[in-house]
Amino acid sequence: MDQIRLTHLRQLEAESIHIIREVAAEFSNPVMLYSIGKDSSVMLHLARKAFYPGTLPFPLLHVDTGWKFREMYEFRDRTAKAYGCELLVHKNPEGVAMGINPFIHGSAKHTDIMKTEGLKQALNKYGFDAAFVGARRDEEKSRAKERIYSFRDRFHRWDPKNQRPELWHNYNGQINKGESIRVFPLSNWTEQDIWQYIWLENIDIVPLYLAAERPVLERDGMLMMIDDNRIDLQPGEVIKKRMVRFRTLGCWPLTGAVESNAQTLPEIIEEMLVSTTSERQGRVIDRDQAGSMELKKRQGYF
């Protein structure tokens, strides 16, 4: 159909489905990284549409840190079972043996060992040559300059100066042995697009995205939701019930909530229309140092 006749969301949908099918046809062993968040839910929905009525021709991979919200784990298992997806879960055994803890070791070391190294271990273990990721260009400046096909060397490192042009939706997937790509089907989507599409398609999401009374404490300018008894309360800190929700989800000690009364998708969409801050403002890992996200991606991060 002529693009001019398609709505904005349907154009984005068609582009993403084209990318997913292109990778499935071009690469021998692709995988979809499933982080359980709203973007992963949209990406999985698009993949199911791309191959309907068949099943996904690739597995889902969750790189588990052991510190996700309990509701995320429940949602992950329920979703994989409901859709009949093959779900691979990998947790860095070395990090587990070391007892890596975001409270003790800090966000930078926790992310490097449990997420970056864990991801590289899983990709090497299964020999994946392409990995779908639900990141978007509007999230963060290093992601804004990354291509849809993001090439990684045999050590899974990203070189922002060594990228290929992508003209007229033509993608060059030629790689040498040991190399791989990260694929971003949602690159051109915005946070607002994601929420509108979730509402339009009635996509199931983790309830943490909707406002509710939750136990939180204030630490370093962040509202931390207390999800289990591993919290290390500092002197003077008090846990209180507040109406909060999450714009992005990760490890609970490193992900800040936002005060909100948005309990439905239309209310979230309305809230996004007047928001002047990035959804990643609550992610502690983005504050580790200047350019921290780009440095992490150069080392093999998502």
From Swiss-Prot:
Pfam family membership, one: PAPS_reduct
Pathway given in the UniProt record: Sulfur metabolism; hydrogen sulfide biosynthesis; sulfite from sulfate: step 1/3
Gene Ontology molecular function terms on file: ATP binding; sulfate adenylyltransferase (ATP) activity
Origin superkingdom: Bacteria
GO biological process, one term: hydrogen sulfide biosynthetic process
Annotated keywords: ATP-binding, Nucleotide-binding, Nucleotidyltransferase, Transferase
NCBIfam families for the chain: CysD, PRK05253.1, PRK12563.1
Subunit structure: Heterodimer composed of CysD, the smaller subunit, and CysN.
Family, as annotated: Belongs to the PAPS reductase family. CysD subfamily.
Function: With CysN forms the ATP sulfurylase (ATPS) that catalyzes the adenylation of sulfate producing adenosine 5'-phosphosulfate (APS) and diphosphate, the first enzymatic step in sulfur assimilation pathway. APS synthesis involves the formation of a high-energy phosphoric-sulfuric acid anhydride bond driven by GTP hydrolysis by CysN coupled to ATP hydrolysis by CysD.
Protein's recorded name: Sulfate adenylyltransferase subunit 2
Species assigned in the record: Shigella dysenteriae serotype 1 (strain Sd197)
Lineage: Bacteria, Pseudomonadati, Pseudomonadota, Gammaproteobacteria, Enterobacterales
Gene: cysD
